[in-house]
């Protein structure tokens, strides 16, 4: 019997993932990664519910202390990024460095498991011609989480299961109710756990970063106002600037050296291309020539046509078919062919358009 270790957050999605695998005859064991430091943090309630789900199913339950790894790989990473004037994407980093890789190692080494599973909304498909495990969007496009999974290596994808990939969220809740799972009515959690635990992302950052007032300037360097700390701002931001102006202004650059926030009009916020680093090719091997794809530059943004040009050193250049707004260093650019996730990387440089938009 195949043994599968299911990552349990204590929410309805991971609970149903475990229950479905258990019902399909897998030897299921539950596992929760203890991530947050300090008493009464988010994991405590989740661990209670996760343990309860495993008790309901009559399967073993394990807790792995990952607090130091989470602090170094996620908390420190996010804080250092905002201090440097970028907007980091902790979720994809967490999936690779804290969750999937370490959980798979623990499951295979300590629990002698064959695979791991999670409650993410994504699908997998084996390609017999290439030997690769392809990552596909979930059936429920509104819940699709492949954007956050682009950085998973083939070694992980070949040993993971996503039981919810063919389900919609309402179907997941219906299954939870039918099975009498204690998490069936549990409210949806925020995508970003740091914001959920601290009340907001701003509150989290203020805990770690000293706010230093500085200037808000236009592209010529003319001072338009004051800011409360560069970590309170992100590229493309329009609200909360506190500037009276004849036309809407957007954050177009953050200068940590001069402690300045640079703003401009909508045209100034448009980018014609960007470069990405730490590229991970997922469903295909790195191509030898440019490819046409649809790129997504934020979790909730719509994919747009682009040309992806592979570069040396795990980098790529992305040319947008039409100028795009709010392309933000530190966020991920993830490119698809239909539902198939081809690859992705972290945006590190943008080129502004000179054409009217």
UniProtKB/Swiss-Prot annotation:
GO cellular component term of the entry, any: cytoplasm
Pfam families to which the protein is assigned, alphabetical: tRNA_Me_trans (PF03054), tRNA_Me_trans_C (PF20258), tRNA_Me_trans_M (PF20259)
Catalytic activity: S-sulfanyl-L-cysteinyl-[protein] + uridine(34) in tRNA + AH2 + ATP = 2-thiouridine(34) in tRNA + L-cysteinyl-[protein] + A + AMP + diphosphate + H(+)
GO biological process terms, semicolon-separated: tRNA wobble position uridine thiolation
Lineage: superkingdom: Bacteria
One function term, GO molecular function aspect: tRNA binding
Disulfide linkage: 94-193
Transmembrane segments: none
General function of this protein: Catalyzes the 2-thiolation of uridine at the wobble position (U34) of tRNA, leading to the formation of s(2)U34.
Annotated protein name in UniProt: tRNA-specific 2-thiouridylase MnmA
Organism: Synechococcus elongatus (strain ATCC 33912 / PCC 7942 / FACHB-805) (Anacystis nidulans R2)
Gene: mnmA
């Amino acid at each position: 019997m195949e043994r599968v270790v299911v990552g349990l957050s204590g929410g309805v999605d991971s609970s149903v993932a475990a229950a479905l695998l258990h019902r399909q005859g897998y030897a299921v064991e539950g596992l929760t990664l203890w991530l947050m430091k300090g008493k009464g943090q988010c994991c405590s309630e989740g661990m209670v519910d996760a343990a309860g789900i495993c008790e309901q199913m009559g399967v073993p339950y394990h807790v792995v202390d990952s607090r130091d790894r989470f602090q170094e790989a996620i908390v420190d990473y996010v804080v250092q990024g905002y201090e440097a004037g970028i907007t980091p994407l902790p979720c994809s980093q967490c999936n690779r460095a804290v969750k999937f890789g370490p959980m798979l190692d623990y499951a295979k080494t300590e629990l002698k498991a064959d695979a791991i599973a999670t409650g993410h909304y994504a699908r997998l498909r084996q390609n017999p011609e290439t030997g690769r495990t392809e990552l596909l969007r979930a059936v429920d496009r509104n819940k699709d989480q492949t954007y956050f999974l682009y950085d998973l290596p083939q070694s992980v994808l070949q040993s993971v299961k996503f039981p919810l990939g063919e389900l919609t969220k309402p179907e997941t809740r219906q299954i939870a109710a039918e099975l009498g799972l204690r998490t069936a009515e549990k409210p949806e959690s925020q995508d970003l756990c740091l914001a959920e635990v601290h009340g907001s992302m701003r509150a989290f950052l203020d805990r770690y970063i000293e706010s230093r007032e500085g200037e808000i300037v236009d592209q010529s360097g003319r001072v338009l106002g004051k800011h409360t700390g560069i970590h309170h701002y992100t590229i493309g931001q329009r609200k909360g600037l506190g500037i009276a102006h004849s036309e809407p202004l957007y954050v177009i650059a953050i200068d940590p050296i001069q402690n300045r926030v640079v703003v401009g009009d909508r045209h100034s916020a448009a980018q014609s291309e960007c470069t990405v680093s730490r590229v991970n090719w997922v469903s295909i091997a790195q191509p030898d020539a440019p490819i046409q794809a649809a790129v997504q530059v934020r979790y909730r943004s719509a994919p747009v046509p682009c040309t992806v040009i592979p570069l040396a050193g795990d980098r790529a250049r992305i040319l947008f078919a039409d100028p795009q707004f709010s392309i933000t260093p530190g966020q991920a650019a993830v490119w698809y062919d239909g539902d198939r996730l081809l690859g992705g990387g972290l945006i590190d440089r943008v080129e502004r358009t000179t054409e009217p938009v």
